[in-house]
Every structure is written in C-alpha cells, then in structure tokens.
Amino acid sequence: MNRTVYFADRAVAFTAEAPGGAWYAVAAEACGGISRAKILNFLESHNSVAVVSDDPDRAFAAFAAECTPVEAAGGVVVNDCGEWLMIHRNGRWDLPKGHLECGERIEECAAREVEEETGVAARVVRPLCETLHAYYFPKTARWELKRTHWYELHASGCAGLTPQTEEGIDSAVWCAPREVADNLRDAFPTIRCVAAAMGRN
C-alpha cells in the first residue's frame, strides 16, 4: 500500500492494487481522485477502505487537497533500562507528540513535545516513520490531515514524570516490554504502527 490515512480506529489506503482480506476496495473516480465525502460514507460501514487507482499518489493528493495540512512530531522515548515512556491521554494509551511550531525543526518539535507532555528531557536518536491522521476540528470547522514524524529518543533515568493534564494526559509511565504490548491493545492504530517501526529498525 502506498499511503494509509487513519480516521481514529479506521483506515483508508491509497493503493495500485486491491489488498484483499478485511479491506473494502473502491475504485478512484474518473478524475483519478476520490472525495472526502465518499470516503467518510464508506467508513460508516467499513473499518478498512482501499482506494484503488492507477496513480495512488494522485488519488491521495486529491483527498489531501480537501484537508488543512498539519505537521507534528513525537516519539518513543527509551530509558537506560529499556523501558518505553507512554502516556494515557483521553482514555487511550499514547505516545508524546504535538504540533510543529513556527521556525522549529521537526526533531526539535519531537523533543519539546516529550518534555512538555511528560516532563522528561530526551535527545533524538533516529527517525522511525511517519503517520497520517485525518480528523474534524470543531474550533475551526475544518478537516485536518496531520502528518506526524516519529523518532526514537533516549532519556537517562526513570524519575521526574509530570503528565500535562491540560492536554488530557492523566498519567505518564515507564513501561517494560510486556506492559508496552498490553497498552498497545488500547492504543490507536497509528501508535501501533510506530511500535512496529521500532521493531523493524
């Protein structure tokens, strides 16, 4: 699959071939794209939708043009004991992340968001992957397409966790591998993608 956009727990892939399995395949329109309205309609009855096109990049671009682009960064913070830093945000397990600020480098954003959301100072080790997340933002009455750049980061020590409660975070914890696996069952698919990228690299 060329690109996958997540709508909370549901996914839309833009691909050249129908993937089969649990994916519900739909053909791109004659213009090469597909409207956001049609995608949302398909997602009402299917968890995974594949938009099949001879030019998946064009189909994705047509969809993306109907959304406001947002850049963000976050990461998997690993301490000296091999534990991961996870947060519990709005009822789901998550990883620290947030929007890119004006004039900020994307790696700087990842480290800043980690510190703001958890109180942990960490340094970027390497890039991991990117995820795409589409959502409706009521304050501006618009759809946004958030591209999050994910990194592995390292932090020394295990203390000093301060969850940013104003961002809906009720806890920040260091998790051993078994705890990470358990928590990922109650995380959004984008977070599971990041965990998989950690395992591949």
What spans do the regions from the language model cover?
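Acidic surface patches and DE-rich sequence motifs
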Residues: 7, 79, 88, 137-138
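Unchanged
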Residues: 100-188
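Acidic, metal-coordinating catalytic segment for phosphate/diphosphate chemistry
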Residues: 33-74
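Nudix hydrolase/Nudix homology domain
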Residues: 5-7, 16-24, 28, 159-201
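Active-site beta-strand termini and strand-to-loop segments that position acidic
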Residues: 77-80, 153-155
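Conserved beta-strand and immediately adjacent loop positions that scaffold enzyme active sites
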Residues: 74, 83, 171
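Conserved Nudix-box catalytic region and its N-terminal flanking loop in Nudix hydrolases
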Residues: 23-26, 78-116
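Short hydrophobic/aromatic beta-strand or adjacent loop that forms the aromatic wall/cage
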Residues: 2, 72, 146-150
